[in-house]
Amino acid sequence: TGKGGRPGRVYRIKQEGIHLSFPRRDASSLLKWSLQLISQLGDEALEQAKIISYEDGRQMMQKLVASHKNHHTLLFDDKLTLLTNSAKLIGYIPEVRSNSNSKSLHFSIYNCPFHDQLTNHAEIVCQLHESYLRGQVDELFELNEFTQIENMQHQCDFCNYTIEVHN
């Protein structure tokens, strides 16, 4: 028994460990350190980071597709809606043009989520961002041609991508 006749405490071992965070949780510092590490380790590290970014883009789109009510029979317009909704979360503004053999998607990115890191690590940031978007597009459209037209790395106000989706 415990104090004053109350029942004593029963302590149990916690299944999950205790997490320490040093320094405080700061995603921008983690991003900065990761970019510095990729920069220092060179091309092989960048290629591995691009693979990770690409797979993350694919997995993100797989989750969005799975949550769609008709995920087994997605039409072009359904896929476009999924891509557009995903794109809007991070500042993409898509425009669609079509012809008889293919449809062209034009993405202009006016609000890069990583613009703070462009000063020191523009090449890395742009390549990782592009591979993420490429992963999302490849998950939705099997036959596509993905082309970067321009990006903020070259002092542009926005990034521009064209995606040709073949029927």
Could you tell me what each predicted segment is?
Residues 156-167:
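C-terminal edge-of-domain segments
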Residues 12-14, 108-110, 162:
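Beta-strand residues in well-ordered beta-sheet regions across diverse protein folds
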Residues 8-10, 104, 158-160:
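Broad gene-expression machinery/nucleic-acid interaction feature
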Residues 2-5, 99-101, 151-155:
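A short beta-turn/loop motif at secondary-structure boundaries
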Residues 141-144, 154-158:
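Coil-to-beta-strand transition motifs
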Residues 36-148:
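Mid-protein regulatory/catalytic core that forms ligand/cofactor-binding pockets
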Residues 2-43:
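Conserved segment of winged-helix/HTH DNA-binding domains
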Residues 15-22, 114-118, 167:
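Short, charged/polar, Gly/Pro-enriched secondary-structure boundary elements
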